Amino acid sequence: MVYTKDLEANWNVFPVSGYHDRLTTKRRIALLIDDGSWKETDSKLVSKDPLKFTAGGSYPERLAQHQKKSGLRDSVVCGHGLMDGLPVSLAIMDFSFMGASMGSVAGEKVTRAIERAIKLKCPCVVVCASGGARMQEGILSLMQMAKTSAALAKLRSAGLPYIAVLTNPTMAGVMASYATLGDVIVAEPGALIGFAGARVIKETTNQDLPDGFQTSEFLLKRGLIDMIIHRKEMKSKLASLLRALAHRKVKVKAVKSRA
């Protein structure tokens, strides 16, 4: 048994098993950003209802329910602050808001976080968590994959670092776009990471899947991610990585062909 107070003091990591439970956006900011340095941006963006989607209730009603329950306007919160003294543009996805589904506002906020990093000439970090695209927005949701990827191409051209932090779960369109485009891709222990779910894959292929399939440990062994970082060490290790990436100098010398 673990008391709630003790669990919260340990950043929602169970002391015996090491299981990383979900963190709220507010707690995630407290974990990663220096006290008093956080400035939220784009907080007033809200989704429209372009498809007049009604399955399972109207989309505006669903949004209102999740906004009231979570205290968030959408599944992404972004802003900038200091991470161990290093200026950084940060976007955080919160699974408590409609499963952190990626809609037009989520994609716009991630894109603006990337563009803000270019403007401020600082690194960008995105903490990823998602169950997939937001079906209530149709193709506008899927469009965010290309939109965010294009923004990251501009960030790379500017020579600025980008780190993707994969938390439980990071699936579908988010995993197939900015979650796997980092200069360094890190994950929390035990995070579920993939495109389609294991059940769907098994039913489609008629094959048994290996133990630990789609976990961060499984994917680390196969090279999809670069590091697994315990939540307690996340801030210090991210800051170290960003400092190393920000000061990289690569010189390429021309080599004459011997042919």
Where are these regions (language model features)?
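Nucleotide-binding motor/catalytic cores of P-loop/tubulin-like NTPases across gene-expression machines
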Residues: 188, 193-204
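Gly/Ser-rich catalytic serine loop of serine hydrolases
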Residues: 167-177
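Terminal-region recognition feature
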Residues: 1-163, 169, 181, 188, ...
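Short glycine-/acidic-enriched loop or helix-start segments at secondary-structure transitions
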Residues: 136, 174, 196-197
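Active-site-adjacent loop and "lid" segments of alpha/beta metabolic enzymes
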Residues: 138, 199-211
